Design a protein with these regions (language model features):
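N-terminal Rossmann-like dinucleotide-binding module
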Residues: 1-50
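C-terminal glycine/acidic-rich active-site capping loop/insertion
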Residues: 211, 235-236, 241-323, 357
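Rossmann-like dinucleotide-binding domain that binds NAD(P)(H)
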Residues: 144-232, 236, 327
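Rossmann-like NAD(P)H-binding beta-loop-alpha module
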Residues: 128-147, 158
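C-terminal helix-rich "cap/oligomerization" subdomain common to oxidoreductases
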Residues: 1-4, 60, 68-70, 117, ...
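Beta-strand-loop-alpha-helix segment that lines the small-molecule cofactor/substrate pocket
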Residues: 67-68, 74-75, 79-125
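Short acidic low-complexity segments
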Residues: 53-64
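Basic phosphate/pyrophosphate-binding loop/patch that engages nucleotide-derived ligands
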Residues: 110-117, 135-144, 163-169
Length: 357
């Protein structure tokens, strides 16, 4: 890749600033040429805080000649922003989800799907842990993957992980979901630490995703699970020859049952002065994942976001494949919506072949 990829951002909220921060961390690879805000006061705040140009219209942002545009706006606003950018012939990186509801997904696909200009900001498979597990699954370490249990993130993000580990594309799926309420303390939320947190009713949603041919996803999400430090993240990938449970791999090999860990090399521990970050992961003495951004001290989620941004940059320059096409993002959200519908109705919901399949 020659020179930093130039991109603009539509939106100035919390998620928008993830992308601005990545450009600041990787100036040799990424450059923000404009941020579109709601008004002049917000534009001034963004420029003052981040040192990047800020404008109040998409047309002004496009005048800066970005190679692609990140759409990081509210759910209701997303389809309109995507349509406007595609109409201008500009590649789009749309934050999740690309439209709020199923009819909106279908309408958006009908209008922009054929353009091939839209990628979706689904980064979870690029996080070091998930990328390591996915590499082992692709290498056949646990045989044919048959089931995936995810207890860490919600709806379309979790669905993306399930589909990736099971290697299912646009397969039809039957969803059965239920919700349960129980008291749980919530010491940390989006707004920060809570003084003297007391147990309050919180919802747990459990869903099965039946893709047929023995392939199963098990979705387990507790309200505010992203932030609550009382709740562990769990992933189980079960295959025909063994299973991966978080960072432990048990499988049948050479007629024996063998258990091996996924090992993280982390610097900045004890007397190590290299800085605190993941360098690589290894399995049975061989490296299976390397952090492409060593030296930046990025968090694991930031590593994934930076990797996705640069992958979109490679794609727009015809130097790499589509990172996460619109059709995949639509499918993830359609299945996530089916989980919510099954909870509401108490019945199975079938996700059949859609217009983007």
């Amino acid at each position: 890749m020659s020179g930093p990829v130039r991109f603009a951002v539509v939106g100035s909220g919390w998620r928008s600033q993830f992308h601005i921060r990545m450009a600041k961390a990787l100036p040799e690879r990424l450059q923000v040429v404009a941020v579109v805000t709601l008004n002049a006061a917000e534009a001034e705040r963004i420029t003052s805080t981040w040192g990047v140009p800020a404008v109040t219209s998409i047309d002004e942002a496009l005048a800066a000649r970005p190679e692609f545009v990140v759409a990081a706006v509210s759910w209701p606003a997303m389809p309109g922003v995507v349509r406007q950018l595609v109409a201008a012939g500009v590649p789009v990186y749309a934050e999740t989800p690309p439209a709020p509801e199923l009819e909106g997904l279908r309408a958006l696909w009908d209008e922009v799907g054929a353009s091939g200009l839209v990628q979706v900001g689904e980064q979870y498979t690029l996080m070091p842990g998930h990328a390591s597990r996915l590499e082992l699954v692709r290498q056949g370490v646990v045989g044919r993957p048959n089931s995936v249990e995810i207890a860490s993130t919600h709806l379309y993000h979790a669905v993306s992980l399930v589909r990736s580990f099971l290697d299912v594309d646009m397969d039809e799926v039957t969803v059965n979901a239920r919700a349960f309420r129980a008291p749980l303390a919530d010491p940390l939320t989006f707004d920060g630490w809570v003084p003297d947190p007391q147990p309050q009713p919180r919802t747990t949603t459990i869903a099965t995703l039946d893709f047929g041919d023995g392939r199963l996803g098990l979705y387990d999400f507790v309200e505010n699970q992203w932030w609550n430090p009382l709740l562990a993240r769990r992933i189980v990938v079960r295959g025909s020859l063994g299973e991966i449970v978080d960072d432990t791999v048990t499988r049948l090999t050479d007629g024996a049952v063998v258990t091996s860990p996924i090992v993280y090399r982390r610097t900045g521990v004890d007397m190590n002065l290299e800085g605190n970050e993941v360098v690589h992961t290894s399995f049975d003495g061989r490296v299976v994942y390397r952090n492409p951004w060593t030296g930046t001290r990025l968090s694991e989620d930031d590593i994934a976001v930076a990797s996705l941004l640069t992958a979109v940059g490679a794609w727009v320059r015809d130097e790499g494949p589509e990172p996460y096409p619109l059709a995949q993002g639509c499918q993830d959200h359609a299945i996530g919506l089916a989980i919510e519908e099954s909870v509401r109705t108490g019945s199975d919901v079938r996700v059949a072949k859609e217009v983007w399949a």
